[in-house]
């Protein structure tokens, strides 16, 4: 079976290639959407569970879903994939300015694409790691992670960027507004 870190690296590199094709300024719009998504999910995580706890205390059937890791994994995966789909297929937030030409434009597109891949695939991996019990039961995740994968899990976006997300959101919005 392919190590999870190999799949992660391949997918992040694929996003880098997409970044080259789409261009630096369009990819920055996706970066803004991803940072706002991560900000929302990290703030929503604790509050959503408290809210559901209050709401489901009287409804037994929903209360059984509340503690189910499969439901939480599907919930977060659908939100992350749905937001990414809209970010790439829906209204495109394109930062103002002209696309840099030549090697500079290619490298900027690659860099921002790699960042977007890290944010997207890293966020998915974070929630898969957090709620991995259903995937282990299905045999999708088997055994322990390699040493590299264990190091990568510690630097996934929700954990690594959590203290900086409010500042990153403001910074990215300022970049969008200032021409």
Predicted regions and their residues:
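Alpha-helical transmembrane segments and their juxtamembrane interface "caps"
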Residues: 1-179
